[in-house]
Amino acid sequence: MIQTETRLKVADNSGAREILTIKVLGGSGRKFANIGDIIVASVKQATPGGAVKKGDVVKAVIVRTKTGARRADGSYIKFDENAAVIIREDKNPRGTRIFGPVARELRDGGFMKIVSLAPEVL
């Protein structure tokens, strides 16, 4: 579960390395986000020459969480880190590459471009 002030690694080549959650989108007073949810975040670490700079406010979708997610068949999927991918308004990623595996739940949220760019879908 991702909440306000949570720091996440960025799993794309948009130029950001780490982001800090400002707000979880979707509903009034929503506290937590899980895999496939959209957040508003601030870039805390960035690589030089990237598309996004330190201090930029961006939207991102969560692709990996340590807490994990329960699937319809009763199984759980968990990862070793919390990670997100920075997206545009049309739900397409800002970067051109995705690093590391992503969860299958992104397919249900309409993030097909992220799923197709990912090296592995679990």
Curated annotation (Swiss-Prot):
CDD domains assigned: Ribosomal_uL14
Keywords: Ribonucleoprotein, Ribosomal protein, RNA-binding, rRNA-binding
GO biological process terms on file: translation
Organism domain of life: Bacteria
HAMAP family the UniProt entry points to: Ribosomal_uL14 (MF_01367)
Homology family: Belongs to the universal ribosomal protein uL14 family.
Quaternary state and interactors: Part of the 50S ribosomal subunit. Forms a cluster with proteins L3 and L19. In the 70S ribosome, L14 and L19 interact and together make contacts with the 16S rRNA in bridges B5 and B8.
Cited PANTHER family: 50S/60S RIBOSOMAL PROTEIN L14/L23, LARGE RIBOSOMAL SUBUNIT PROTEIN UL14M
Protein name: Large ribosomal subunit protein uL14
Organism: Streptococcus suis (strain 05ZYH33)
